[in-house]
Amino acid sequence: MVDGLNTSNIRKRARTLSNPNDFQEPNYLLDPGNHPSDHFRTRMSKFRFNIREKLLVFTNNQSFTLSRWQKKYRSAFNDLYFTYTSLMGSHTFYVLCLPMPVWFGYFETTKDMVYILGYSIYLSGFFKDYWCLPRPRAPPLHRITLSEYTTKEYGAPSSHTANATGVSLLFLYNIWRMQESSVMVQLLLSCVVLFYYMTLVFGRIYCGMHGILDLVSGGLIGIVCFIVRMYFKYRFPGLRIEEHWWFPLFSVGWGLLLLFKHVKPVDECPCFQDSVAFMGVVSGIECCDWLGKVFGVTLVYNLEPNCGWRLTLARLLVGLPCVVIWKYVISKPMIYTLLIKVFHLKDDRNVAARKRLEATHKEGASKYECPLYIGEPKIDILGRFIIYAGVPFTVVMCSPVLFSLLNIA
């Protein structure tokens, strides 16, 4: 029993691919952010701790209210619907789906999405680690998800909400700028975007992953990222800093600076890995754009958007395997071999792995608590950054060459 709740048989794992997992953690200190205030007071600056204490007012009593709402609408169909639609905010979804607009002639739109998504992920991860606020507790909630990994992050802000907000605003902005479309078509497309948005955002509450503060703060981050991207894109159209020789150095340096100076959480939280991935993608697409404009590599800019279903299918059948082969087959062994064997960087992965092993095999009361912050190996940060920077190179530089050779450009 925990706070009057029966905790027997409280963790239910899916037995088939189609069924989501139902997680409850009776030892709530195993989830980050749930320790008493003294745990954070000694590990935070006074300013940071005071902000956290003020925000706790919005999270302390949310779990039972959210649990009643979840119980009211819980069904097998909703479990499947909201867990699988949540994949539209997942890491793998972006790896496979973000390249597609590039192959159909929408490179600039993809750049907009990469900037908005990349900085939404970074800022939401930064504030998660800065505030160290807990997710709603389960029990009384059920965390309905396809992966236990995501349940071990802090709560606010919601990165799913930040992404959905920024991208939905971008879609709506582009829809209402389509002068060749009728108002009826624009309204229909807007309804589709809003349906996507409501599904992704309210799904976070239904799945027991986030509370109201998480959604509001995530939404604000998405709005800010959209406004900043649009402001710089249209306010300084003639600046063209991406055409200067130093721009790739600045892009890579800026991305790595943001990552190596990222705020340190108090407890272990895996969301930093997504920040590394997206900062790599941002830098990668900037460097590809620079190569295209400085050296005249224009194949990606010449791809025709209205190409018919045969060419559309052909580009997908050629482009997607290229991305999968780079990301999931050759990139990791190649990049780590170069970093360790050629550039002689120290491989510090074993040190972090040993610390994690020790943290998860504690004796006594401490084995019922999440470990304190251990951090990512420096070689993993650099390696992951380069691997994900390689995804835009595969999409923007390699795939259009293959399209041209196969006469599907």
Curated annotation (Swiss-Prot):
One of its GO terms (molecular function) is sphingosine-1-phosphate phosphatase activity. The keyword Hydrolase applies. Keywords: Endoplasmic reticulum, Glycoprotein, Hydrolase, Lipid metabolism, Membrane, Phosphoprotein, Sphingolipid metabolism, Transmembrane, Transmembrane helix. Changing K128A: Impairs dihydrosphingosine 1-phosphate phosphatase activity. Residues 15-35 are annotated as: Disordered. Residues 157-160 are annotated as: Phosphatase sequence motif II. SMART domains: acidPPc. It is a multi-pass membrane protein. The modification Phosphothreonine is found at T16. It is found in: Endoplasmic reticulum membrane. This is Dihydrosphingosine 1-phosphate phosphatase LCB3. It comes from Saccharomyces cerevisiae (strain ATCC 204508 / S288c) (Baker's yeast).
